């Protein structure tokens, strides 16, 4: 009898950690936890890793099998998903970014979305469409590093489409404000002056 009680007690002690870990697993799939995990990974620029928890968060259903109500966090999760698609150079990123703008036309992220669409067109070599989207965005409202990247692409678009006057203006502006692009801008400004026959 003593052996039976000790076996039961031993089994209970061995199974207790398994029960505790099962409860932890349930907590990790809660909507709030999924959102926080995805947001943290996104902020760390681990875009590929952020997609899975963010998609799981967006697909969450309530007890009746209906999608959870549209909250600010849901919109933010969808924003992070389309930005992750852009950062990972998804071929469908332009469509995803445009669909996000169609779904949430009043989003506070609209300016950045326009800049990302423009940048996607730039990387495809579609400079006219890139210029149209860059001109829809206010680059001065972006973060410093992203603003400089987008301004460089804008100036390059002007150069590629033959508008050397605008290209020179943007390259000169960027040269005076960005250390990262100062050498590249100086090169392009010299190139533009050379093509115009100005050797000063």
Which residues make up each language-model segment?
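Alpha-helical transmembrane segments
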Residues: 4-12
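Acidic, polar-rich low-complexity tracts and alpha-helical solenoid repeat scaffolds
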Residues: 2-5, 21-200
């Amino acid at each position: 009898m003593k052996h039976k009680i000790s076996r039961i007690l031993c089994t209970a002690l061995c199974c207790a950690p398994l029960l505790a870990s099962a409860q932890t697993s349930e907590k990790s799939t809660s909507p709030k936890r999924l959102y926080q995990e995805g947001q943290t990974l996104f902020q760390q620029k681990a875009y590929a890793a952020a997609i899975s928890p963010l998609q799981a968060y967006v697909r969450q259903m309530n007890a009746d099998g209906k999608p959870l109500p549209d909250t600010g966090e849901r919109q933010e999760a969808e924003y992070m998903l389309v930005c992750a698609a852009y950062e990972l150079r998804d071929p469908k990123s332009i469509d995803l970014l445009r669909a996000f703008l169609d779904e949430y036309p009043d989003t506070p992220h609209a300016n950045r979305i326009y800049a990302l669409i423009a940048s996607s067109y730039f990387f495809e070599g579609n400079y006219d469409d890139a210029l149209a989207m860059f001109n829809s965005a206010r680059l001065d409202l972006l973060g410093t590093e992203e603003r400089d990247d987008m301004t460089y692409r804008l100036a390059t678009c002007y150069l590629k489409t033959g508008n050397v006057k605008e290209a020179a203006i943007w390259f000169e502006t960027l040269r005076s404000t960005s250390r990262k692009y100062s050498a590249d801008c100086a090169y392009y400004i010299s190139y533009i002056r050379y093509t115009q026959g100005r050797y000063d």
